[in-house]
């Protein structure tokens, strides 16, 4: 099935036609001057959804996510704390990886640290100077001349003639009102940088933030990428500058598809550390919410729409996951009779799966996919309540254990995309299921001694049996 993605560069949905196999995917990672907030994780979960959908559709993916461990903010933090850059950043790096695991975000294939690629960055800057697209300013910093790159502004759709063009800027972050030549190598300032610098042919200093991503992506993925993803904040100046640098170095198109997620809001305002209205994942875990609940909240809205964060939204996510958990537990009930997978159940599953996938291939429309999931759950619950399969006029077959297992297999399949379904137990080995069936048979003929023996045998294999009013359940110890 064809996948269509909204390309920021063209401002259109385009059929995804990768140039590379595996697909080369680069995503903007954290700047490790502090703990990542959940606004950041909205972007990372969007990128995780993108990757999961690609894998689900059969693509191989090589994924690189950078770690920015040298920039204005990390230097300021290390200077304030009076420690090395590495010592300052390391706790935030460890916390970031722990957060990824808590939120069930798949690991990237590589996590390059900017500080590990300084020699390659220096070499690239020298190449840009030799080409005449970069120059050394009066402050001894090296700048990229945007006037030497004719396509500058294409990604962010800037009309350069209508914008005020300053001479140059050495800050890592700035807005469109300060359009200017941007820094490639920031000259060393002892009052600002302390003892943190690298030697180069241009003098002591450190690389600019924009150059870092260009060099790390080119070093690990080559000169032309299939997809570059990040937050909408990164379109200008960061990604615009990446294009200018990278294409000046390679003389090839840098990225085929640019994807950007929109802001997470708090009280209808953008969540950001500068505004002081942010929450870290740890804040929410301390309030009693789970990683799955946070993931579901951040996952459920379309990535190109703003998502408003509220406590009510988190509680709604909790209820949605409870509904999913109750449904899964119901299917895992082993008391259903043995029978075939009824055609009506198989048809309902296939219809749901087709709707689920079709929505995802339409620019990752997860909202529509989740709506289809809950509609499917409603239909199956209704049929179980009636002790039948999916009813037709000619067939009212009893809902079977095989029906339940078929649906559970389908849910495990779609969880390859969602990464959030709360399965209450792992797959039960066939030999344990056989012992469970033998025990049920012994109980039916009131052979309690044999039933107890089989219970002990099941326990010895790491599973427990719970007998209740609604039937018997098997759980892993």
UniProtKB/Swiss-Prot annotation:
Subcellular location: Cytoplasm
Lineage: superkingdom: Bacteria
UniProt main location, coarse: cytoplasm
Residue numbers binding Zn(2+): 28, 213, 238, 242
Motif, 'HIGH' region: chain positions: 30-40
CDD domains: CysRS_core (cd00672)
This protein's record includes keyword Ion transport: no
EC number(s) per entry: 6.1.1.16
Motif ('KMSKS' region): 270-274
GO cellular component annotations of the record: cytosol
Keyword terms of this UniProt record: Aminoacyl-tRNA synthetase, ATP-binding, Cytoplasm, Ligase, Metal-binding, Nucleotide-binding, Protein biosynthesis, Zinc
GO MF annotation list: ATP binding; cysteine-tRNA ligase activity; zinc ion binding
Cofactor(s) needed by this chain: Zn(2+)
NCBIfam families: cysS
Family: Belongs to the class-I aminoacyl-tRNA synthetase family.
Subunit structure and binding partners: Monomer.
Protein name: Cysteine--tRNA ligase
Organism: Chlamydia trachomatis serovar A (strain ATCC VR-571B / DSM 19440 / HAR-13)
């Amino acid at each position: 099935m064809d996948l269509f993605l909204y390309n920021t560069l063209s401002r259109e949905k385009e059929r995804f036609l990768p140039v590379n196999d595996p697909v080369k995917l680069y995503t903007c990672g954290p700047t490790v001057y502090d703990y990542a907030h959940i606004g950041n994780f909205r972007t990372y979960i969007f990128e995780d959804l993108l990757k999961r959908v690609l894998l689900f559709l059969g693509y191989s993916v090589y994924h690189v996510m950078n770690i920015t461990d040298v920039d204005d903010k990390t230097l300021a933090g290390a200077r304030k704390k009076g420690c090395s850059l590495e010592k300052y950043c390391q706790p935030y790096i460890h916390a970031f990886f722990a957060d990824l695991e808590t939120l069930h975000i798949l690991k990237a294939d590589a996590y390059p640290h900017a500080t590990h690629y300084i020699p390659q960055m220096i070499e690239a800057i020298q190449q840009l100077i030799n080409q005449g697209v970069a120059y050394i300013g009066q402050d001894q910093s090296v700048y990229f001349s945007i006037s030497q790159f004719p396509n500058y502004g294409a990604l962010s759709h800037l009309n350069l003639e209508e914008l005020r063009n300053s001479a140059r800027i050495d800050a890592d972050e700035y807005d469109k009102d300060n359009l200017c030549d941007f820094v490639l190598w920031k000259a060393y300032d002892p009052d600002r940088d302390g003892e943190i610098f690298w030697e180069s042919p241009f003098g002591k200093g450190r690389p600019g933030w924009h150059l870092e991503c260009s060099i790390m992506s080119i070093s690990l993925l080559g000169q032309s990428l299939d997809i570059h993803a990040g937050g909408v904040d990164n379109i200008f100046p960061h990604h615009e500058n990446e294009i200018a640098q990278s294409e000046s170095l390679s003389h090839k198109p840098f990225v085929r598809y640019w994807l950007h997620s929109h802001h997470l809001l708090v009280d209808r305002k953008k969540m950001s550390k500068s505004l002081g209205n942010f929450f870290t994942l740890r804040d929410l875990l301390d309030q009693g919410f789970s990683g799955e609940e946070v993931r579901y909240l951040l996952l459920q809205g379309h990535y190109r729409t703003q998502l408003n964060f509220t406590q009510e939204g988190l509680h709604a996510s909790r209820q949605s996951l409870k509904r999913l958990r109750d449904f899964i537990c119901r299917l895992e009930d082993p008391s259903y009779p043995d029978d075939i997978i009824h055609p009506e159940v198989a048809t309902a599953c296939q219809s749901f799966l087709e709707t689920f996938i079709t929505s995802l291939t339409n620019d990752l429309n997860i909202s529509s996919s989740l709506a289809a999931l809950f509609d499917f759950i409603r239909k199956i619950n209704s049929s179980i309540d009636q002790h039948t399969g999916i009813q037709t006029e000619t067939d009212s077959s009893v809902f079977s254990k095989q029906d339940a297992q078929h649906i559970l297999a389908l849910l495990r399949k779609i969880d390859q995309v969602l990464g959030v379904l709360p399965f209450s137990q792992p797959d039960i080995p066939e030999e344990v299921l056989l012992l469970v069936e033998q025990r049920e048979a012994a109980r039916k003929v009131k052979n309690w001694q044999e039933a107890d023996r089989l219970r002990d045998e099941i326990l010895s294999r790491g599973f427990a049996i719970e007998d209740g009013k609604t039937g018997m359940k098997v759980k892993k110890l």
